[in-house]
Design a protein with these regions (language model features):
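A conditional alpha-helix N-cap/helix-loop micro-motif detector
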Residues: 59-63, 86, 112, 132-136, ...
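Short, flexible loop segments at the rims of nucleotide/cofactor-binding pockets, characterized by
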Residues: 55-61, 128-133, 168-170, 216
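Catalytic core of membrane glycerolipid acyltransferases/transacylases, capturing the structured
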Residues: 75-135, 161-166
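Hydrophobic alpha-helical segments typical of transmembrane helices
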Residues: 14-17, 37, 92, 118-119, ...
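Non-catalytic C-terminal accessory region of glycerolipid acyltransferases
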Residues: 29-30, 35, 71-75, 98, ...
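Active-site metal-coordination segments of metallo-dependent hydrolases
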Residues: 7-13, 112-113, 173-176
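Membrane-anchoring hydrophobic helices of lipid-metabolizing enzymes
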Residues: 1-83, 118
Length: 253
């Protein structure tokens, strides 16, 4: 992946995205981030083949903020988990379900029609059984899951055509307002979650403190403010280890 990655079509998108993140003149830093990104991408791809082993043995995964997770389980009330495509992001939902969270995850199918069935099978079998396909039907399905006491997990770091243009690393990026909409409508906490890969390819999942939402937040302005806050959290997560985020998406299109 380190050799092939720079040759693919999205390399220009990656460079443009990194220009927004660190500026157009720091070429050495850009190359370092790209090298780490492709290396992590390759490792994550290989790890898909071993998701069953990760499911059976989580000794390589630690959780920071487990008390927050235990409190969520104890309260037995749905929450909205939000994150991005960091390190091996699939392991976050896997660990949430392993710990006893009733969870449904919103996903975007891969553009590769040959690879997508395999990925969906692996996710349903070893990561999280309840998968919701992104889209209008997926929103309705999410509401049904919430009414059945399921928490919802979704990635909010990618561009969504139906989103709002909101600040993200100094530019304006189409951003999903779905977490804010669901949280304010059903009075649910929003819980950011992050995963880091260390040099030994062990992982630490961090459960952030819940963001409390009240009924006074259920208007359009407050939903936008809440979404901007979530964007800032994603920015902070990316900045912790830029090489472990996927820079190939045209986030600012």
């Amino acid at each position: 992946f380190n050799k092939i990655g720079p040759l693919i079509k999205s390399n220009q998108i990656i460079n443009d995205n990194l220009d927004k993140f660190i500026g157009p003149y720091n070429e050495n830093k850009k190359e370092e981030i790209k090298f780490k990104m492709w290396k992590n991408f390759g490792k994550t791809f290989v790890e898909y083949l071993f998701l069953k082993k990760f499911r059976e043995n989580n000794s390589h995964i630690k959780i920071k903020g487990e008390n927050t997770l235990l409190k969520i389980i104890d309260e037995n009330k749905p929450v909205i988990f939000v994150s991005g495509h960091f390190a091996n992001f699939e392991l976050m939902s896997m660990e949430l379900t392993r710990k006893g969270i009733k969870l449904a995850t919103i996903y975007r199918p891969l553009n590769n029609y040959f690879l997508n069935p395999f990925m969906e099978h692996m996710r349903r079998t070893y990561v999280c059984r309840d998968q919701i396909k992104k889209g209008l039907a997926g929103v309705r399905e999410s509401i049904n899951y919430i009414k059945n006491n399921f928490s919802i997990a979704l990635m909010i770091d990618q561009r969504v055509s139906e989103g709002k243009r909101l600040p993200f690393f100094g530019g304006m990026a189409l951003t999903s307002t779905l977490p804010a909409q669901l949280a304010t409508k059903y009075q649910l906490d929003i819980v950011p979650i992050y995963i880091a890969r260390d040099k030994n390819d062990d992982f630490e999942i961090e459960i952030y403190e819940p963001i409390k939402v009240s009924d006074v937040d259920n208007n359009e302005i407050n939903k936008i403010d809440l979404t901007i806050k979530l964007n800032k959290i994603i920015e902070q997560m990316i900045s912790r280890e830029p090489g472990h985020w996927i820079w190939t998406h045209n986030r600012w299109k």
